Amino acid sequence: MNLNKHSERKFDLITVGRACIDLNAVEYNRPMEETMTFSKYVGGSPANIAIGTAKLGLKVGFIGKISDDQHGRFIEKYMRDLNINTDGMVKDTAGRKVGLAFTEIKSPEECSILMYRENVADLYLTPEEISEDYIKETRVLLVSGTALAQSPSREAVLKAVHLAQKNDVIVAFELDYRPYTWKNTEETAVYYSLVAEQADVIIGTRDEFDMMENQIGGNNEMTIDNLFKHKAEIIVIKHGVEGSFAYTKAGETFRAQAYKTKVLKTFGAGDSYASAFLYGLFSGENIETALKFGSAAASIVVSKHSSSDAMPTADEIKALIANAD
């Protein structure tokens, strides 16, 4: 699989899904009830991956629905300031708001997120708002699992995947499982599997792959045996502090360690991992090196207060790897 084919296209990557607001506790080591001060950042896995890859120098676009208010304008301006193309960003005209995520940092081991995602704008992206002309201008389309949780966003994502395949666009699927968005695990398994069978690159944690398979305690070999019967060329399965594995349809297996760091919080790691892994592939690195990039980026982000603002540069990633090796 060659991510660098169609070099004449306008974008390296377009991400599809949610953009929301993260409100991260400024006061550490105390519960939410006692926290008085929060800092505001752009959040949401597809938005964070767009931001992470843009900071790494890729040409990036974004498709998603945001609120037509101050928070929506904050998100749009932040992304535009990073040269992320927002032509695929739609404003909700029915008064729906973007999701809000309040983070609680009691300790590095005890972090939690209080979500406000009732009737959120991103899940009302419609198939009619997906443009084939926009999608055919990218080399890779990245879709998020959370965007499959509800109609009409679900159908919008399925249309985007169909248009990507029609126009020889590589499809990357970031599982991005969030339990608060889904009705039940059976529904999750159905729609995750539907997209995974059409994806060229699949990235997720071991637990997220278990959700897709609707089981507990699955193993990597069974997962890849099933998925390689379909379209997948590369499957990345993350195992937290035990590191991550990448498998190819050609039968290769690669592993990267998790880099030690002073952990401040536990969220944001997955988005930075996906950003840096894809950047590595776009840069012509081998899969093993791309895995290292992902692990290093995740290590950097969990050591900092934000997720989107903390997305590292290529120099920061390479410096961490060099110092660790």
UniProtKB/Swiss-Prot annotation:
Alphabetized CDD domains for the sequence: KdgK
UniProt catalytic activity: 5-dehydro-2-deoxy-D-gluconate + ATP = 6-phospho-5-dehydro-2-deoxy-D-gluconate + ADP + H(+)
GO molecular function, one term: ATP binding
Keyword Cell cycle found: no
InterPro entries attached to this UniProt entry: Carboh/pur_kinase_PfkB_CS, DKG_kinase_firmi, Myo_inos_IolC, Myo_inos_IolC-like_sf, PfkB_Carbo_kinase, PfkB_dom, Ribokinase-like
Pathway assigned to this chain's UniProt record: Polyol metabolism; myo-inositol degradation into acetyl-CoA; acetyl-CoA from myo-inositol: step 5/7
BP GO annotations: inositol catabolic process
Pfam family, one: PfkB
Keywords recorded for this protein, A-Z: ATP-binding, Kinase, Nucleotide-binding, Transferase
UniProt EC number: 2.7.1.92
Function: Catalyzes the phosphorylation of 5-dehydro-2-deoxy-D-gluconate (2-deoxy-5-keto-D-gluconate or DKG) to 6-phospho-5-dehydro-2-deoxy-D-gluconate (DKGP).
Family designation: Belongs to the carbohydrate kinase PfkB family.
PANTHER family xref list: 5-DEHYDRO-2-DEOXYGLUCONOKINASE (PTHR43085:SF49), HEXOKINASE FAMILY MEMBER (PTHR43085)
Protein name: 5-dehydro-2-deoxygluconokinase
Highest classification ranks of the organism: Bacteria, Bacillati, Bacillota, Bacilli, Bacillales
